[in-house]
Regions:
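SIR2/sirtuin-family catalytic core signature
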Residues: 1-42, 222, 278-280, 284-286, ...
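Gly/serine-rich nucleotide phosphate-binding loop at the start of the catalytic core
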Residues: 1-184
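Short secondary-structure boundary/capping segments
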Residues: 55-63, 185-193, 250, 319-321, ...
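Acidic, metal/cofactor-coordinating or nucleic-acid-engaging core segments within structured domains
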Residues: 244, 248-298
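A short alpha->loop->secondary-structure connector
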Residues: 62-71, 187-200, 307
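A short acidic (Asp/Glu
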Residues: 51-57, 180-185, 245-246, 313-319, ...
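Cofactor-binding loop segments of dinucleotide-utilizing enzymes, especially the Rossmann-like FAD-
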Residues: 46, 174, 237, 308, ...
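Extended, H/D-rich, highly charged conserved domains that either
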Residues: 83-116, 122, 162-267
Length: 395
């Protein structure tokens, strides 16, 4: 099948006289050039965690099927779900947004304890949330899931270590799962995700201004950045984040749990919609989106977009703003998002698009990107030695 690589509206492969034998090499060389830029960012969408976790379409289908067969959901609410689904094009986040709005409306005009409508609406919301939670809260020891986890590990093995004179890599993700954390922990790669503390970890966006450094000289205060480190921004929340105001030290009211669990009495932060009691406009979402915007406006930046379909207008607006105000910002979309998306209609030489017309394992799949397109940074020349040592000592 055909591999495509466009710069703006221009076919990059044609202008560089590519043939079937060197197409991938030409794309890889260009991507390698971007890694020499001062600031390298990645944006992950649901495609990076497939098939271990369903994408948004898959989540909707699972919710729809279970609502149809659930006897505890009233027919009126089943019909309400179907009506909202049609109006919101089966987008599960937007469906939840409407239901959150209805719940707040009912809560505002009547006493919740006396309202059957409020109880039923709340029941439907919790039912949907629990399905989503269960689909995301997977076991990382199951074969299908370990395959995806290994891809994440390979990704971080390739990109985590950078020259100390360059900025650390930033990973922004709309995913709520724990694949990033699992991979980083398995590889002993340091990461900052906005939480600080020991046994109890609380959200503090100031952490994104910190870095890990090591002392270079025991006699004087001389430090240099730790190379194997990344910043992780979960801009749509995480399965292991909950609201918690029990501690006086938790100024932002968000706690990171070691093991994810679902509790109807606590709000798990994996459903950010504009109508969810304005939470997506407040902390932690406002802080995370602000960081996203700030990073894209830094000079000499590149954003690699993987597995994201440009379906979140808030995220899209920040990308558009970076293109409009930062002349040194480059955007590399490695996904077949379709020509109907507004971003694909822009003729700008700072926008690159890579995809393949293949129904099996096209070049824009996460596995193929990691194995065939991403450069293997020189700093990782010791990774095989270390991996072999760890393997042998365990045996």
């Amino acid at each position: 099948m055909a591999i495509h690589f466009f710069q703006g509206k221009e076919d990059y492969l044609t202008t560089h006289h590519a043939n079937d034998d060197n197409k991938i090499e030409i794309i890889k060389n260009k991507i390698s050039e971007f890694f020499n830029m001062k600031n390298v960012h990645f944006l992950f969408g649901s495609g990076t965690s497939c098939p271990a976790i369903p994408n948004m379409k898959g989540l909707f289908e699972k919710v729809e099927e279970k609502i149809k067969t659930e006897s505890n959901i009233q027919e009126d609410n089943k019909n309400l779900f179907n009506t909202i689904s049609k109006k919101k094009n089966n987008n599960i986040e937007e469906i939840l947004g409407v239901l959150y709005s209805k719940r707040e409306f009912l809560k505002g005009i009547i006493e919740p304890e006396d309202s059957e409508k409020y109880k039923e609406c709340n029941k439907l919301i919790h039912f949907i949330e629990k399905i989503i939670f269960d689909e995301i809260n997977i076991s990382f020891t199951e074969n299908a899931n370990t395959v995806v986890l290994d891809i994440y590990k390979s990704f971080y093995q390739k990109i985590a270590l950078r020259n100390k004179d360059l900025s650390r890599i930033n990973i922004f993700t709309t995913n709520n799962d724990l694949f990033n954390e699992q991979a980083l922990d398995a590889l002993n790669i340091h990461y900052i995700n906005g939480f600080n503390g020991g046994l109890n970890k609380y959200f503090n966006p100031a952490m994104f201004n910190y870095t890990y450094s090591k002392r270079m000289d025991t006699t004087i205060d001389r430090f240099e950045p730790v190379e194997n480190m990344v910043y992780l921004y979960k801009i749509h929340g995480s399965i292991n984040w909950i609201e918690d105001t029990s501690s006086n030290n938790n100024y932002f009211g968000i706690k990171e749990e070691y093991k994810p669990f679902y509790d109807e009495t606590k709000s798990t932060l994996i459903y950010p919609t504009p109508m969810k009691q304005n939470k997506s406009l407040g902390s932690p979402y406002s802080d995370l989106f602000r960081e996203f915007q700030h990073k894209l406006l830094e000079p000499n930046s590149v954003l690699f977009v993987i597995g994201y379909s440009f379906s979140d207008e808030h995220v899209n607006d920040i990308i558009y703003r970076a293109l409009a105000t930062n002349s040194t910002f480059n955007l590399v979309i490695i996904n077949n998002i379709g020509e109907d998306k507004p971003i694909c209609k822009i003729n700008d030489n700072r926008i690159f698009k890579v995809w393949e017309d293949d129904n099996n394992e096209p070049i824009h799949y996460f596995k193929q990107i990691v194995n065939k397109l991403l450069p293997n940074l020189d700093a990782f020349k010791q990774k095989d030695i270390l991996a072999e040592f760890i393997k042998q000592i365990k045996e």
